[in-house]
Amino acid sequence: MKRVGAHVSIAGGVENAPLNAQKIGAKAFAMFTRNQRQWHSAPLSTASIEAFRRNCEEAGFLPQHILPHDSYLINLGAPEVEKLEKSRKAFTTEMQRAEALGLTMLNFHPGSHLNLVSENECLATIAESVNLSLNATAGVTAVIENTAGQGSNLGWRFEHLARIIELVEDKSRVGVCLDTCHLFASGYDLRTPEAFDATLAEFDRVVGLSYLRGMHLNDAKQKLGSRVDRHACIGEGMIGREAFVHLMQHPAMEEIPLILETPNSESWAEEIEMLYSFEKE
């Protein structure tokens, strides 16, 4: 089964996320486990944790279909010691929050070198950050998201992802989430079935399809290789409808979270319905 969903709100408490996902006909969802614009958050209450688990169970969401995302403030490759320590502490806390909620994954953007250190040094720092958090937790997989390659962000080449994975000690607890907009923006074409398959084959060659834990489904507002991260609604951007029809029929997309982050949350229910209709074309 294809597990399409969206990145839903946790307003009023994390326990509302599965309810919000259910309302839009989702079969998977993403969420933040706290306010992602702040460094510090109050610990999750026992009541919230229990309500979250109960709501997930009642709505039929299994842990492997839920892909929480860490705060955008975190930079696990930060060249400055103070920012790096702050990021590592925050990331470990988020891994622990995911663990407390009974979840098995945490999605994160790799990090940025800020033009202060080399790419290789930054990738090694990111991997060491992941190792520290994995050692401080149990059962939660760190899921690296590919990036569009804006600024000094790393993770826009498959080789970056492969290098981080190579340096992570526990390979059973590291994975990848591929964002279609980020792929396209960083130069990986998806527009035709042939282009889509070639990109997936390249990912398999460099990283390995066995590491694929989820997808973010977004069309792109900018052209191929623009290195600009601007999401568009499905079928309304430069990637186009055909890519998403092929994705919804692709066997590699079975039973992993396929998460919409398109600009208009009001249309997510319609986009989910549309994506499911693509399976039948």
Swiss-Prot record:
Cofactor: Zn(2+)
Top-level lineage group: Bacteria
Gene Ontology MF terms: deoxyribonuclease IV (phage-T4-induced) activity; DNA binding; DNA-(apurinic or apyrimidinic site) endonuclease activity; phosphoric diester hydrolase activity; zinc ion binding
Catalyzed chemical reaction(s): Endonucleolytic cleavage to 5'-phosphooligonucleotide end-products
Signal peptide residues on this chain, from the entry's feature table: none
EC number: 3.1.21.2
Textual note on the cofactor: Binds 3 Zn(2+) ions.
Residues given in the record as Zn(2+) 1 binding sites: 69, 109, 145
Swiss-Prot/TrEMBL keywords: DNA damage, DNA repair, Endonuclease, Hydrolase, Metal-binding, Nuclease, Zinc
Disulfide bridges in this chain: none
One of the GO BP terms on file: base-excision repair
Entry's family note: Belongs to the AP endonuclease 2 family.
Protein name listed in UniProt: Probable endonuclease 4
Residue sites binding Zn(2+) 2 per the record: 145, 179, 216, 261
Metal-binding as UniProt keyword: yes
Positions of Zn(2+) 3 binding: 182, 229, 231
Role summary: Endonuclease IV plays a role in DNA repair. It cleaves phosphodiester bonds at apurinic or apyrimidinic (AP) sites, generating a 3'-hydroxyl group and a 5'-terminal sugar phosphate.
